Amino acid sequence: MKTQVKALVVGGGAVGTSIAYHLGKRGWDTMLIERDELTSGSTWHAAGLLPLFNMSYATTHIHKYSVDFYKSLEAETGLNAGFAVVGNLRMAQTEERMDEYRLYASTAETCGVPYVFMSPDEIKAKWPLIRTEDLKGALYHHTDGYINPADVTMAMAKGARQFGVAIERKWQADGFHWTGSHWEVTCTKMVEKGGNLVPSEEQIVITAEHVVTASGNHAQRTAKMLGIKIPAIPVEHQFVVLEQDPALVAYRAEGNPEHPVIRDADAQSYVREERGGWILGVYEKEAPARFEHGVPDSFRADLFPLALERIEEQYMAMIHRVPSCEDSGLKDDFNGPICYTPDGNPLVGPAPGLRNMWLAEGFSFGITAAGGTGYYMAQMIVDGEAEIDMASLDPKRYGNWMTTEFAMRKNEECYDHVYILHHPDEERPAARPLRTAPAYDRQKARGAQFGWVNGWERPNYYGPLDAPEDFDEKSRSFRRGAWWQYAVEEARAIRQGVGLVDATAFTKHIVKGPGATAFLDWFTCNKLPRVGRINLTYALTAHGTTRTEYTIVRLSEQEYYLVSAGAWTAYDQDYLKKAIEDKEADFGRIELQDVTTQWGVFALAGPKARDVLRDVINDPDPATALSNKRFPWLSARQIELGMCPVNAIRVAYTGELGWELHHPMEMQNYLFDLLEKAGAKHGMKLV
């Protein structure tokens, strides 16, 4: 058994096997270790569906690659991957569901995914067993279908071996140590004992330049060993297999092709053929998260007891949609753990705070994503970045504020929300509010309807004061939601008067030290500002593509204040930190501080913004303190507003006069009240 490789993949499910295959194809000396047998985690009990439908640009590319890749595996390896290209029929019972599909169509066209819309009559003519009188239409992908998860994994494993990849079963990773140049991974031989898989006394250490973890349901164990947080926790997922349906058997005996995968999103379920019968898979309410502290050794290729009471509604919906199955008995059932993340997207990319450690965790649609994940992950590892933007899947989109309970509650919600209408302005309520700025209660009392960004509550708009709790949820639409009228009023206030925006969720970093200027000049692509001035700039990747947009304020010759998007605090900090470590020897000492939670931000914008600030600024000459001469565009000054010290930045992203008011977080309520009172006589509106 080899003990030194260029890349080590930990986990032998579909995802890990695909990554090993694609690294081997790129010519890398690669090994895969699996603590049990290949596919023994979630892969073996997956339904094997390959849906191309996804609202995410990156995920759609991943799924499309998988579907195309799986079709080529047999020719390459000689193994049939079990791909049934039957198509996927995604039905709509409402016009709003059709609107969702119309929105998706733009993503599909951008990514080159073929689709057609079908009318109820067209569906009935093509598949007469499907009841259609209550449908508005459907979205049909003719190029996808379903696959045998074990077969496709074994085909990828054979392909990987053909590229020289070593695959070792019954070896468990028990420790990771970074030496500064490579990883030393302590591995233990696993043995059978009393039906359980237990560690033996045999251990080895594998040396690898790069490590990829694809540990599936064991992600929490991986997180503990690496000393990081991975919000990938399994949720129970059920599907049942029915006995043969005589009407279906007769239909197929007439020479008709297999039905497509039938997705009834409004009934939270999918149906597909299975040997003359049907499989019903559901995404029901109240499915619990499991193994939040790790998978017990006694749980191997096991299942949970079926909870039929949870899926009764979906079972009846299947009978409604395919009436011929009503008399088919229950043949088999599955209730197994499927990993989820708080937003439903997997965690794919560099691990936070670690060098040459890569995560491929949290796949709720792992079979669909496996092929594409392996392809794009290999690009990231070998080339430095993928050919598509993978930021939406980056593991660092959650910071250290994330906890086990948060992940459990959000993952359960995500499972429950698989088939809800995914409006562009969708906000999900679980585990909220969690991160709130001091002015949260004041804003809520004034009608704020909040959005969620990186755990922070941030006002999206201000609705009626007497709005019910579900006002925002009921206001959503794929066309023009009820929030529109309030957004119009807020936009008009900034265009014609003045508005106050809470931008506290912005990411904020201090970069200082003898090497700060040289480093930032290298790190960003615009000219650095003079002291007291600001510039808008971008941090680039090693390949020269855009990674992060920054507002940079130069506080002194060697001290800078960096402001970036609130959603990417950990993402930006990790990139900054690693870049500083790489360049400190060249540029000199550089200090990085995350001050996001120390500073609140209000943005005051509109033609009357200067009038509001003039009434509260503490300055020897208030009349000129905020003039273009004393406070020009793209400049920054420390000012006092009443008793509050403020780092004011003359910038606005509204196209109007404006300032960002960066203030001590503990003084936010004081400043809010001060500005609200001063703004009242100028018609200031909360925005």
Where is each model-derived feature located?
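Glycine/proline-enriched, intrinsically flexible loops and inter-domain linkers
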Residues: 389, 394-687
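Glycine-rich FAD pyrophosphate-binding loop
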Residues: 24-44
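Dinucleotide-binding Rossmann-like beta1-alpha1 core, especially the glycine-rich loop
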Residues: 48-126, 266-271, 276-277, 298, ...
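Flavin-dependent oxidoreductases
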Residues: 18, 57, 176-304, 313-321, ...
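Flavin (FAD/FMN) cofactor-binding and adjacent substrate-gating region
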Residues: 71-72, 84, 93-170, 174-189, ...
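C-terminal catalytic lobe of FAD-dependent flavoproteins
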Residues: 266, 275, 297-435
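Glycine-rich Rossmann-fold phosphate-binding loop(s) that bind the pyrophosphate
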Residues: 11-13, 35, 362
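Beta1/beta-strand and adjacent pyrophosphate-binding region of the FAD-binding site
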Residues: 2-15, 31
